[in-house]
Amino acid sequence: MVLRVLSRSCKLTTALAFGTVGATLYAAEAAPTHPAHSVKHAAPLGSAPVRHRNAGHATSRTATDAETIKVTTRKLPTRFNTEQHVGSSTTMISAETLQQRAVITTTDIQKLAPNLQIETQYGSSALNFHLRGVGFNDLTMNNTPSVMPYIDGVAYPISSMTSGPLFDIDSIGVDPGPSGFTHGQTTTGGEVRITTKAPEKQFHAGIAEDFASYNRSKTDAFVTGSITHNLQYRLAAELLEGGGYYTNRDTGQSLGDQHTGAIRGKLAWQPDEQTDVNLTGYWSLNRSEAPGFRINNNLSAFAGHYGRDLGYYQTGWDIKPAFAKLIGYHDTKPQFNDLNWGFHLAMAHRFRFGQLDISSAYDAVQLHEYQDQDGMPYATADDYRTQVANSFTQEVSFHNLKDSTSRFSWDAGLYYNRIMQKQNNYYDFSDYALRGYMSETRFSSPQETFNQYVTLGYKVLKNLRFVGSISHESDSRQLVDLTTIHFGHNDLNFGTHGALANQFTGKVGIEYQATPTSLFYADIRKGMKPGGFTANNTVVAQQAQPIKPETILAYEIGTKNDFFAHRLRLNAAAFYYDYRDQQVLGNIVVPSYGSVGSYVSVPRSTIWGVEGSMEAHPTRDLTLTQVVGYQRGVYDQFHSINAAQVNAYYAKTGIWQAFYSNYHGVDSGIPKISMNGSAVYTIHVLPHYHVLFDVDYSYRGAEGLIPGNPPYRTVPAYFLLNSFLTFEPNSRKWSATVYATNLADRKYDLTRSQATNVQTAISGPPRFIGGRLNYNF
């Protein structure tokens, strides 16, 4: 550190230098790559700290306007150092890691965090998030998730709204456990927070092109800069094409090509030094081919023609002219036609005693998806779904301006969300003997959620802090005019149903900063998720009844540590969940019809586990990471359909009959082990150029998807190995990369399901070998 102070007192100089560095340590760690700079005319000592848009720059306060202090920050090996002083088990993922680990879609995030699963809903574009065994398989896309996805601070409570491309990302935070105490909506499972890149004052642009196996191409571009001295912009776009690896077993046609495009625009305005206004608009279109369903076991009358698929990427499809006419479908392959768009407005004003944040968001989705769920050219389970939905969110929050010396902290806010949606779900059962018709289930579903929250923190000692939170959420939703039409047979009208939830949740916690780089914490949290409805192929009144809200009482202890000047990071956590009225996807057996999906509540269950992460920099050129998660879940009180026994009886007799089992003490099917790790080595080949070489892996344990964990609905464990080699200048202005994902070409499944009496799976991607060029200017 170099100090040049126009002061007569050397003692004052020393005090200023060390006092400033100590006060700004967290900020300097948060963005270690910022260059040294000088600050003149600093605020007087004792003035309120101000949160600036570029809050990672080291700043200094001086005694007189004549003084100048020059501060040089040291680049630390680790990232996200500020988060190391927060009592939570959040996993932070940087933009660089996302690119290096070839994260193409949102589902790829699960390869980087412990005890996290992100899966498509039986091959649709809608996503289901599970964290520490808590999650919800939203078969009907009309219920609130247990794990809430956020993009730039805006909650997405409809699963189909998270289907857009993942591009121009700044960071991702995976935060397990009940949430909703400082922002947003109450959850039982946690949050996945995606933050996109913000506008910059200096002009900056870039383009990246990625080519890979199966004719997959991915193009990303952005441009950012200033319009005026206090108005900045950023425009980013992505185009993803190809990559289909499924093959029609009869015709040899390929299936699964991606055809997606998206654009996002941002404006950042600072009308004065204490106010920030940010406007975001986005648009994305998905006209991709649907994934293929591989037959695992065929109990239908066509088993002689289409038995178990031996080729791992085999599938089949067809669409009958009558069904195509009914739904107005003109393509020959199963395909999506989804449109997502929205606007977000966020305003922040800093007072001397606190910051006021106001945000408004409007998001909309128009979804049209056709899938051949039986994987055959016969019409036993051909599905076409349409959804038109919009979400309006308004949030007002107020918090004090905290810094490392603050003894008291507080956050308070109000959150409101209103959703309107309409759905039509068509099925073609023409070739299924027990039905032999086409059907449509339609409904509309308005819902409102209102959450109020307060969080208080107090340092009883310099290094000991207590935290307390309370929130109250009310939720009202309806299922309006639920109707199922069996064309040529009958109409079933189930009327209108409602569900209410009105509960308090909260948190108490303690944080102990044992050393400047070692934190210990413990907390108890209660979370709540509203109830909801089954609204997919509804044939009996029981399906239309609402499920109860679920609650969790969560206990967690953890520690965060940096050793050897931040060259070794070790974080660990242990948790225990007391789960009440857990919402799971079960079955109802309807005689002379078959087994149909329906949400059921598990009165009592428990989940417990441990997590650990390591980041090591043994040398300047070597980085090692390792993440491990272990979890167990059991049903303590649960009596439900035994799906395996139902199917076995049908296979033997051709009759659908309900059989029930007591699942007390039975494993709930969550993946017990999840791991990922990487080794990245930098080779300095020339004075101004280097090569990055990486080997990384991910492992996920077996996952049972329905109670009892029958094999046909259990996704086996899998291990994936990846690698990349990047050549770039030290300035990182451009880079050239070759990479491989699933290097060992492992055969694995993304999900397993059953459509009428055909048990199917969706195969995971095979080995992809690709190259990526990136240029910034």
Please report, for each region that a protein language model flagged, where it lies by residue:
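N-terminal Sec signal peptide and the immediately downstream disordered periplasmic leader
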Residues: 2-12, 18, 24-101, 106-115, ...
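Acidic, small-polar-rich N-terminal luminal/periplasmic segments of exported/outer-membrane proteins
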Residues: 56, 61-202, 557
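Outer-membrane beta-barrel translocator/receptor signature
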Residues: 144-146, 158, 167-176, 181-263, ...
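Periplasmic-side early beta-strands and strand-to-turn transitions of outer-membrane beta-barrels
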Residues: 200-202, 210, 221-319, 324, ...
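Conserved C-terminal beta-signal and adjacent last beta-strands/turns
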Residues: 224, 391-403, 408-413, 459, ...
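Structural signature of Gram-negative outer-membrane beta-barrels, strongest in the C-terminal barrel
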Residues: 268-272, 398-401, 407-417, 443-578, ...
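Membrane-embedded beta-barrel scaffold of Gram-negative outer-membrane proteins
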Residues: 346-351, 355-371, 513, 519-527, ...
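Gram-negative outer-membrane beta-barrel transporters
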Residues: 399, 576-578, 600-706, 774-776
